């Protein structure tokens, strides 16, 4: 194998790690909605996490959703009262094709 090709393959593998869906969140009262679009050729698994402001209000996580290439998804969660914070986590989905 040529040394230049090995570096190129490593750079491509590192580049693949940044294939995550573009997401934005919206908070309306006690409800949080995440709007995600995946413009990349790899599937991204996203999950919405909501932290409620009140100590007695239970924090929640949505079920993970796989967003395929060019796909769009909306995830929602809520608190009983005010929302303290919300964020999205991303997890790459392994390529199901053998040999990759």
For the regions a language model picked out, list residue spans one by one:
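Post-signal peptide N-terminal regions of Sec-secreted extracellular proteins
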Residues: 13-100
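Secretory targeting and sorting signals
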Residues: 1-13
